[in-house]
């Protein structure tokens, strides 16, 4: 966002991110983005200030692939994604604080951006080398497209690259312009 010309503060939101029973992945990411934005705006927003919150998940065959708990789970996720297409979904919520700094938003806007990502067919050796690098261990779906090793996994992408990184910047900037 700084590269887009915005002065930002990063403030983590302390919310419960547990999915509801039978909650669809896209519904989940939008709900979490809204909850994060509301929590941060209520606590920290100044008059007319914007709060941008996001949550990103990786989904495959309708199930959410979170961060791997250990190397075995990372290997299993990478094998599952090997040669296949999965989705990266980011829910975004932008809240414009009221001009009197009331905790309630004067306006808000939210959306979900989805990008299809297709992996190359991965050999066991490639998976082992990538897992051994440690790179997949703190990433949803056990990979980071922006990482050194992660770049080597992706065969094709349909949608916004920056959505896969974690924030669809161009769409966020356009949404901000609507609120200003």
Label the model's feature ranges.
Residues 11-17:
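Short beta->alpha connector loops at strand-helix junctions that form conserved
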